[in-house]
């Protein structure tokens, strides 16, 4: 029996809401593989220290929070010039693995911006912020071709439009080819 709000109840009204647990070994492997793979797309490579900690997490020896604490301590004790951006790769990898391990998500521009903030806080000053200036960038994945990005003044509206279009698009019947 439970007393809830001054009312005597026979069952727990929150019993069906379970606290999310860490994922199983297979899913942890997927999350880490994805996290490290996404870093490779930007030409970044994580440290062996992170890879070892990720394996310990996959094996169930340590939690994601413990991986983060170990990593934070590692970089506090061993500051680097970081010309190869290994620290960034390590910190963003653990953050990606953590986000992929959460079962909370909403397909909205705010969630998108929140993910950017979670990934890049402490790495970039603009983490979780919509830029207020126009940019271009040469992309190595496009053999150095320059990409012109959307106008800064319209980014919020463009983002909302793109999300709305994507929500209403049907992938039913499309092949993987």
What are the functions of these language-model segments?
Residues 1-177:
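FIC/Doc superfamily catalytic core
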């Amino acid at each position: 029996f439970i007393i809830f709000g001054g009312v005597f109840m026979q069952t727990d009204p929150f019993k069906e809401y379970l606290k999310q647990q860490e994922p199983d070994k297979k899913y942890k492997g997927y999350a880490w593989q994805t996290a490290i793979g996404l870093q490779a797309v930007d030409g970044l490579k994580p440290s062996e220290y992170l890879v070892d900690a990720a394996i310990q997490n996959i094996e169930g020896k340590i939690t994601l929070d413990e991986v983060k604490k170990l990593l934070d301590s590692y970089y506090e004790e061993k500051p680097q010039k970081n010309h190869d951006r290994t620290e960034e790769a390590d910190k963003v990898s653990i953050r990606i693995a953590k986000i992929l391990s959460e079962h909370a998500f909403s397909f909205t521009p705010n969630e998108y911006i929140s993910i950017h903030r979670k990934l890049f806080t402490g790495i970039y000053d603009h983490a979780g912020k919509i830029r207020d200036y126009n940019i271009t960038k040469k992309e190595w994945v496009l053999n150095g071709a320059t990409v012109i990005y959307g106008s800064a003044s319209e980014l919020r509206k463009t983002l909302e439009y793109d999300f709305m279009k994507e929500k209403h698009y049907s992938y039913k019947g499309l092949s993987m080819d």
